[in-house]
């Protein structure tokens, strides 16, 4: 058995530029991985079945699980038939705007590539990943990224300052499909550019924007309340990540971030995490 860490992500900004003919939306986003991890353990077993175990949580299992589909996709590409046990130690909240499922799938692709000695490049793995989900290539890319298209066209963003984030999840599961179905598109913006950084926290705060937030907040006003609580505990700015329901605050230092996370973790049903960027 070999184990791998699958990090969460946040969207520092998320702009919806329009609806495509294929039903997806054209996006422009700044995405960053953060130090909240699922642990994925992989071990080969007799036969050809791919089994998924995730103790303590209700997740799709078997081929309904994105991690299992990732394993099958890699086996198919390599022309391999193997049995596999996938054990997921789930720490990233589910359906929370943090990309946990996509990260798990990306980690399975990369882990099996190493374990089997396939030698597939990151680009080749990303080609498989995008078939599983739009966010999967980002976790294979392993850099802060300006993501366009459906989120699958990635350009590295350099110079992001060493800020801290506090992630707050109130235990609400939000359907990404529902959010996009209820999104009212505004006029397109054609002046968006890859952000440049000189290393200050204010540069991150100035970018905070999420077109999906108005939809989710209308149904779940608690998200707006969490933003205000983060600001009251020292956050320089706060935003919903992805389609929600997780909210993150931007902090200048670890001590203030950890104190805020401890405070917010005491609320019934809430989970809060002080995290740092993952840039390698």
Swiss-Prot record:
Query: What InterPro entries has UniProt attached to this entry?
Result: GHMP_kinase_C_dom (IPR013750), GHMP_kinase_C_sf (IPR036554), GHMP_kinase_N_dom (IPR006204), IspE (IPR004424), Ribosomal_Su5_D2-typ_SF (IPR020568), Ribsml_uS5_D2-typ_fold_subgr (IPR014721)
Q: Which residues form the active site?
A: 9, 135
Give a short account of what the protein does: Catalyzes the phosphorylation of the position 2 hydroxy group of 4-diphosphocytidyl-2C-methyl-D-erythritol.
Its EC number(s): 2.7.1.148
- For the ligand (ATP), the binding residues are 93-103
Annotated family? Belongs to the GHMP kinase family. IspE subfamily.
Q: Which UniProt keywords apply?
A: ATP-binding, Isoprene biosynthesis, Kinase, Nucleotide-binding, Transferase
Pathway(s) where this gene product acts = Isoprenoid biosynthesis; isopentenyl diphosphate biosynthesis via DXP pathway; isopentenyl diphosphate from 1-deoxy-D-xylulose 5-phosphate: step 3/6
Instruction: Name the PANTHER family for this protein.
Output: 4-DIPHOSPHOCYTIDYL-2-C-METHYL-D-ERYTHRITOL KINASE, CHLOROPLASTIC
Q: Name one GO biological process term.
A: terpenoid biosynthetic process
Output this protein's name. 4-diphosphocytidyl-2-C-methyl-D-erythritol kinase
- Per the UniProt record, the source organism is Syntrophotalea carbinolica (strain DSM 2380 / NBRC 103641 / GraBd1)
Reactions catalysed, as given in the entry: 4-CDP-2-C-methyl-D-erythritol + ATP = 4-CDP-2-C-methyl-D-erythritol 2-phosphate + ADP + H(+)
Q: Which GO terms describe its molecular function?
A: 4-(cytidine 5'-diphospho)-2-C-methyl-D-erythritol kinase activity; ATP binding
Give the domain of life.
Bacteria
Pfam hit, one: GHMP_kinases_C
Q: Which gene encodes it?
A: ispE
């Amino acid at each position: 058995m070999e184990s791998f860490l699958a990090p969460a992500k946040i969207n520092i900004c998320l702009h919806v530029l329009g609806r495509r003919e294929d039903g997806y939306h054209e996006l422009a986003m700044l995405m960053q991985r953060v130090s909240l991890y699922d642990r994925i353990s992989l071990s080969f077993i007799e036969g050809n079945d791919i089994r998924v175990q995730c103790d303590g949580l209700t997740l799709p299992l078997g081929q309904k699980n994105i991690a299992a589909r990732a394993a099958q996709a890699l086996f198919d590409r390599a022309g391999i038939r193997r049995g596999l046990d996938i054990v997921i130690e789930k720490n990233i909240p589910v359906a929370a705007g943090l990309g946990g499922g996509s990260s798990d799938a990306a980690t399975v692709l990369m882990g099996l590539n190493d374990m089997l000695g396939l030698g597939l490049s990151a680009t080749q793995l990303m080609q498989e990943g995008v078939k599983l989900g739009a966010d999967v290539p980002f976790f294979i890319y392993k850099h802060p990224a300006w993501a366009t298209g459906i989120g699958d066209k990635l350009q590295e963003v350099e110079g992001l300052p060493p800020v801290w984030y506090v992630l707050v999840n109130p235990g609400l599961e939000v359907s990404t499909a529902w959010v996009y179905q209820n999104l009212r598109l505004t006029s397109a913006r054609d002046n968006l550019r890859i952000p440049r950084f000189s290393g200050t926290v204010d540069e991150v705060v100035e970018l905070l924007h999420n077109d999906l937030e108005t939809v989710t907040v209308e149904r779940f006003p608690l998200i707006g309340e969490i933003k205000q609580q983060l600001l009251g505990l020292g956050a320089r700015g706060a935003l919903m990540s992805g389609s929600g329901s997780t909210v993150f605050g931007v902090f200048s230092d670890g001590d203030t971030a950890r104190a805020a996370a401890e405070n917010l973790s005491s609320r019934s049903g809430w989970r809060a995490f002080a995290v740092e960027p993952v840039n390698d």
